């Protein structure tokens, strides 16, 4: 039986209930009648991945490196490593079909080249019965879809355009664009890919036929308008851009006309417009009205003429224009409301006509923060800060009474309301008008009269509308030949001496003339004195006549004409009662004494007379010298006779300051000065004792206090107080003994606590002490004590010796999963891993283990039940028996089967060689085969009415034996008479638990195939539905021509490495999600890489985005709420590198290597210098220093590209410097770097053509008004043709 083959064949097929089944083994390709199994079918009739172990026929197609290859010749088995020389690559590109005119029925999968240049209209009709995933591509190759119609019609399913609208037809309007139609969800989804959008330069030379999506650049090569004709066909929303390259459009204009009368431009019914602005703009097609709507990017405010009532728009400039002077008219201008704060309006009223009134009116809830009066040359006292601002509802201007202004108003809002404030007010300035009294009353400007005009007298017809300034008025002085002004002479100028050089251009008033009296040195007016005035002798301003002089006789009461007393025989009186003679005769009153007579008049004890002054020695001694008995003491000598310790004399009373000083020994103190010497902090003296009330008041600084009053003050408990809630308690007084105590703090009482000791802090029992951070940190947690504890480091955790540190989850995970020293060994308990593969077992099912036992791991691994059973499968069960086939056990020949007779064998018959039968093999019982069973033709299992099956027993639980028996059953229920008779014939494969799969032909003739579990095929071709109730596992790729539909929220999971990826649709959003590391089949982690809103289609990138190539945003713009970082590529030729399509755009590069940044400009060291005039320091630019920096590029095209280079000096005193340069497209090179100045890096004088502030040299300098040097101002003096020097504080 050992020779029995594992494969068996049948000439006509196996008997399987009347139906043929395929061979078990692979078919022979040379035998035409040989059946095939699934393996052969997949091997020979599908496109598979290249297999180096098999052979291939000529033209057999395989997949290698994601490409299709066909064998050039037969390749024998094994084919070996892939050799491209033995294979021919197959084409996978689309077969493009060119359509130039007429109608065309599109088919799914077609790629159409649309030739619009042929000049014909083309209509494409979409398929009527597409399936999901069908694709059609249309590519314009003619470039004229806007002129020649390209219409795509959907007869059944609608087309979804770029706005999400479902339509039945669309136009291809963009030149060289590609239109992709994908059938999905019962709709044709349309995508338009435009050709690279480039500028189209249009000149006046020819009329340009525009197309949708054109970017037209106007360039005026001649002084003529540019003509542009709009396309014949356009889709709703199509745009054509216009740019004025050389800004000449305002001079030569652009004329835009529609293709025909079916469309309009700017306004319905308008077929031609002329543009005269220079700013960019675009035309957008409105299909609803067949109208090209215009957006003009020109933001310049242009004047709007207003002749009737009008509503003013924000940021608008208007002008009120009157019809004529005979029409009385009131125009109301309504200001807008609820607009943006800061919006302005400008209203010009300088073209109002006579009789015209303009009312500028705010909305009902708004106010105008001014009035007409404040806008018409107000007085200083009529507006703040002298007065309050006013608000009005409207401003009314009349052309006849007001000075019509140009008024600019700005809109603001605050907590008080909404206002229009006057940003600028320019009233019309009139010239003065002397026509009549009414015109003379109006304010106006006036020219200044020249000096010659100002000097004209009234009879010479002077000018009426010129103003005389104080200067010209002051210069119109009176002369002998003209009237004018003259200065009144001052008293000083009039009352000069006779010899003075008097002025001839000033006048003397009667008062000044009357004041010029005659004196000894000047001529003047004077009165004649009366006799009384003469006798009085006190008036020095009147004159005396001879008569008056003669009448003035001298007397005791009047000086006058007198006679001298005689000097001969003069004798003094002998006693005081008597008279002497001559000069001694005191009764004579009409004589005058001459000096000689006076010298005779000496005083004696009995006679009055002249005395001689005593000398100092006589005064001090108290005795006259001999012969000078008439000596007398003068105040001077008397003053020298001062009182000392040794003599009597005069003594001076001390002043109060001298008394207060207390150092003078020669002066006397009076009671008053003694009383006024009051004691102060710096002066000893007398003082009054304060009363108790005065002492308690504490404001008197001039009195003294006694000890009793001080004690009385400080011995009172009223002097102190505390806040009981703060835990303060007081006792005693400030005089006797004052005690201030702080209560101990508790849960209800504020107070003070002492600092706990380390022992007390560790004990944790006291509730009336406080713990400092040091004590808290010193209270360490141990096995016997609670306290603070430090988290152990990873190395401390691995060491495992610390008893006072805590293990974090992170370090616990480390020692449990990664630390080898914590693994379990034969000596210690510890962490283990589960073993797998060669770590558990190395061997086979013949000899068992083939590896030395000592080479297996002894430590850190545990064997799982799976691994245990896998290894035990290679060994006999414990109670199994093995037979020794080499022994006969002493049997004789009679006990053996003979070949020549029929025998019945009672025992078991075992054949070790092939058994050949020429007759049928019939068994009334069962048959068992230890090897394969083969039949050359048919293997029939007869059905005698009982169910038939093929059973594969499980065998012993060892080696590769199955755990359950398997059976193949063929049955049906069509004849069973039950309620279900639909299962006509069933081929079922199962085990002891349930069926694995079955194939059944139903009563209606259809075949169904059911798998109760996971399908792991190489390839499956299913022409109908395939229902899998469990899990289907595919060992290779799965390709579907239709959709993969999953009704689970989580679908399409991909697993590789530590992570799983799947797509989740939670009804509101669709997510791209990842699992946690090591949980590839689990739920999602916290990352949200991609989110799609199911309603809007909006995509949210939650975890960052790296774009390796470019990205294009066609509409909607880009909003970034965080930073954008665009890093360029630094190359060695970065300084001179010309931009390319890959490098145009915004990027930034940090340059830190000297080889690169030395090519770029640096920063300038600033050198401190001193101003030679002011002595103050100032900074001046010094040498250039190269430094690292950042190069940033801006611009979207080569026409708008520029770079900024900003240096970042490495020293703190240096300043950052910014440079910039532009790409010169016409020169194909960068311009030179130029420096950008700012507040931190101002330009030097030489940078702007100015002079430095110190040591400047120039050829000449003209100053119009004045020159100032420090506090000195040098002002020109045109009258004297020189300069004046003025000191300015």
From Swiss-Prot:
Entry superkingdom: Viruses
Principal location listed in the UniProt entry: virion
Compartment(s): Virion
Transmembrane segments: none
Keyword Transmembrane on entry: no
Keyword terms, alphabetized: Late protein, Viral tail fiber protein, Viral tail protein, Virion
Coiled coil: none
GO cellular component assignments: virus tail, fiber
Family of this protein: Belongs to the tevenvirinae long-tail fiber proximal subunit protein family.
Subunit structure: The long-tail fibers are trimeric, with a stoichiometry of gp34/gp37/gp36/gp35 of 3:3:3:1.
Protein purpose: Structural component of the proximal-half of the long-tail fiber. The long-tail fibers of T4 are about 1600 Angstroms long with a kink in the middle that divides the fiber into proximal and distal halves.
Protein name in UniProt: Long-tail fiber proximal subunit
The organism of origin for this protein: Enterobacteria phage T4 (Bacteriophage T4)
Gene responsible for this protein: 34
């Amino acid at each position: 039986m050992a020779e029995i083959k594992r494969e068996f064949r049948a000439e006509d097929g196996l008997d399987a209930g009347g139906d043929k089944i395929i061979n078990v083994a692979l078919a022979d390709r040379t035998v035409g009648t040989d059946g095939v199994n699934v393996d052969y079918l997949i091997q020979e009739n599908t496109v598979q991945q290249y297999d180096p172990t098999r052979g291939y026929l000529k033209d057999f197609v395989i997949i290698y490196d994601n490409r299709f290859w066909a064998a050039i010749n037969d390749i024998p088995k094994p084919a070996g490593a892939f050799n491209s020389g033995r294979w021919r690559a197959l084409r996978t590109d689309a077969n493009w079909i060119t359509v130039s005119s007429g109608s065309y029925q599109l088919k799914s999968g077609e790629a159409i080249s649309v030739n619009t240049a042929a000049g014909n209209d083309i209509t494409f009709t979409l398929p009527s019965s597409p399936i999901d995933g069908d694709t059609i591509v249309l590519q314009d190759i003619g470039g004229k879809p806007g002129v020649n119609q390209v219409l795509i019609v959907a007869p059944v399913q609608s087309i979804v355009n770029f706005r999400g609208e479902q339509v039945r037809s669309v136009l291809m309007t963009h030149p060289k664009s590609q239109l992709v139609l994908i059938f999905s969800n019962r709709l044709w989804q349309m995508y338009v890919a435009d050709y690279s959008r480039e500028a189209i330069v249009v000149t006046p030379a020819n009329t340009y036929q525009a197309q949708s999506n054109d970017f037209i650049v106007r360039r005026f090569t001649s002084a003529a308008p540019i003509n542009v004709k709009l396309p014949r066909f356009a889709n709703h929303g199509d745009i054509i851009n216009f740019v004025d390259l050389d800004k000449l459009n305002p001079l030569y204009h652009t004329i835009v006309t529609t293709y025909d009368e079916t469309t309009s431009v700017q306004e319905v019914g308008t077929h031609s417009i002329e543009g005269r602005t220079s700013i960019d703009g675009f035309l957008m097609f409105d299909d609803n009205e067949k109208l090209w709507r215009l957006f003009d990017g020109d933001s310049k405010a242009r004047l709007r003429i207003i002749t009737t009532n009008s509503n003013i728009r924000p940021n608008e400039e208007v002008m009120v224009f009157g019809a004529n002077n005979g029409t009385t008219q009131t125009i109301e201008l309504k200001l807008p409301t609820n607009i943006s704060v800061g919006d302005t309006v400008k209203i010009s009223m300088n073209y109002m006509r006579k009789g015209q009134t303009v009312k500028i009116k705010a909305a009902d809830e708004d106010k105008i923060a001014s009035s007409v009066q404040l806008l018409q040359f107000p007085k200083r006292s009529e507006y703040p800060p002298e007065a309050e601002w006013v608000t009005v509802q409207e401003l009314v201007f009349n052309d006849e009474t007001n000075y019509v202004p140009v008024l600019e108003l700005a809109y603001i809002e605050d907590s008080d309301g909404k206002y229009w404030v006057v940003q600028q007010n320019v009233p019309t300035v009139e010239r003065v008008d002397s026509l009549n009294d009414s015109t003379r009353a109006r304010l106006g400007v006036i020219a200044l009269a020249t000096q010659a005009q100002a000097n004209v007298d009234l009879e010479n017809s002077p000018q009426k509308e010129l103003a005389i300034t104080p200067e010209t008025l002051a210069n119109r002085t009176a002369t002998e030949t003209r009237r004018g002004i003259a200065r009144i002479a001052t008293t000083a100028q009039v009352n000069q001496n006779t010899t003075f050089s008097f002025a001839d251009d000033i006048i003397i008033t009667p008062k000044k003339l009357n004041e010029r009296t005659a004196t000894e040195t000047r001529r003047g007016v004077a009165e004649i004195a009366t006799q009384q005035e003469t006798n009085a002798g006190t008036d020095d301003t009147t004159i005396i006549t001879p008569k008056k002089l003669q009448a003035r006789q001298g007397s005791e009461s009047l000086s006058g004409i007198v006679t001298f007393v005689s000097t001969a025989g003069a004798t003094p009186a002998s006693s005081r009662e008597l008279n002497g003679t001559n000069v001694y005769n005191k009764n004579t009153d009409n004589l005058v004494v001459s000096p000689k007579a006076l010298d005779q008049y000496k005083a004696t004890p009995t006679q009055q007379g002249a005395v001689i002054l005593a000398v100092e020695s006589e005064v001090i001694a108290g005795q006259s010298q001999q012969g000078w008995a008439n000596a007398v003491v003068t105040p001077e000598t008397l003053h020298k006779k001062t009182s000392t310790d040794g003599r009597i004399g005069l003594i001076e009373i001390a002043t109060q300051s001298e008394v207060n000083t207390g150092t003078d020994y020669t002066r006397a103190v009076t009671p008053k000065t003694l009383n006024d010497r009051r004691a102060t902090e710096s002066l000893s003296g007398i003082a009054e004792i304060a009363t108790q009330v005065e002492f308690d008041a504490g404001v008197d600084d001039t009195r003294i206090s006694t000890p009793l009053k001080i004690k009385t003050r400080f011995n009172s408990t009223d002097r102190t107080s505390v806040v009981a809630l703060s835990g303060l308690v007081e006792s005693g007084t400030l005089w006797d003994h004052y005690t201030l105590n702080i209560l101990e703090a508790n849960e209800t009482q504020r107070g003070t606590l002492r600092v706990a000791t380390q022992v007390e802090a560790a004990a944790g029992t006291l509730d009336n002490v406080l713990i400092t951070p040091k004590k808290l940190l010193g209270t360490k947690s141990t096995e016997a004590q609670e306290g603070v504890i430090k988290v152990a480091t990873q190395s401390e955790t691995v060491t495992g010796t610390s008893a006072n540190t805590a293990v974090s989850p992170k370090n616990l995970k480390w020692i449990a999963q990664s630390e080898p020293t914590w693994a379990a060994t034969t000596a210690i308990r510890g962490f283990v891993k589960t073993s797998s593969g060669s770590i558990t077992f190395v061997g086979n099912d013949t000899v068992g283990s083939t590896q030395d036992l000592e080479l297996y791991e002894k430590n850190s691994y545990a064997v799982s039940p799976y691994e245990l059973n896998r290894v035990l499968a290679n060994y006999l069960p414990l109670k199994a028996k093995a037979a020794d086939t080499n022994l006969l056990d002493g049997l004789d020949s009679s006990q053996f089967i003979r070949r020549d007779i029929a025998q019945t064998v009672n025992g078991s018959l075992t054949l070790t060689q092939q058994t050949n039968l020429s007759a049928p093999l019939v068994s009334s019982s069962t048959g068992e085969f230890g090897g394969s069973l083969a039949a050359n033709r048919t293997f029939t299992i007869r059905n005698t009415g009982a169910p038939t099956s093929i059973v594969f027993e499980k065998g012993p639980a060892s080696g590769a034996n199955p755990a359950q028996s398997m059976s193949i059953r063929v049955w049906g229920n069509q004849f069973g008479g039950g309620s279900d008779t639909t299962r006509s014939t069933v081929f079922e494969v199962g085990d002891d638990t349930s069926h694995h799969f079955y194939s059944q032909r139903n009563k209606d003739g259809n075949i169904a195939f059911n798998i109760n579990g996971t399908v792991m095929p190489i390839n499956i071709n299913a022409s109908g539905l395939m229902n899998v109730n469990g899990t289907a596992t595919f060992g290779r790729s799965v390709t579907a021509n239709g959709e993969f539909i999953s009704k689970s929220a989580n679908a399409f999971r991909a697993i590789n490495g530590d992570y799983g990826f799947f797509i989740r649709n939670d009804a509101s959003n669709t997510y791209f999600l990842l699992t946690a590391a090591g949980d590839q089949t689990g739920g999602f982690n916290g990352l949200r890489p991609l989110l799609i809103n199911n309603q809007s289609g909006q995509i949210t990138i939650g975890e960052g985005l790296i774009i390796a190539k470019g990205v294009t945003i066609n509409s909607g713009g880009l909003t970034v709420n965080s930073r954008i970082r665009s890093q360029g590529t630094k190359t060695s030729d970065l300084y001179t590198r010309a931009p390319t399509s890959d490098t145009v755009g915004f990027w930034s590069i940090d340059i830190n290597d000297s080889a690169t940044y030395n090519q770029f400009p640096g920063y300038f060291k600033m050198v401190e210098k001193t101003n030679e005039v002011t002595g103050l320091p100032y900074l001046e630019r010094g040498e250039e220093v190269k430094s690292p920096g950042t190069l940033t590029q801006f611009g979207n095209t080569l026409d708008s590209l520029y770079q900024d280079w900003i240096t970042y000096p490495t020293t703190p005193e240096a300043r950052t410097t910014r440079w910039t340069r532009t790409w010169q497209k016409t020169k194909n090179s960068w311009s030179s770097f130029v420096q950008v100045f700012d507040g931190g890096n101002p330009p030097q004088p030489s940078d702007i053509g100015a002079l430095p502030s110190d040591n400047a040299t120039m050829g000449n300098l003209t100053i119009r008004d004045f020159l100032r040097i420090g506090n000195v101002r040098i002002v020109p003096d045109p009258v004297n043709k020189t300069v004046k020097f003025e000191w300015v504080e």
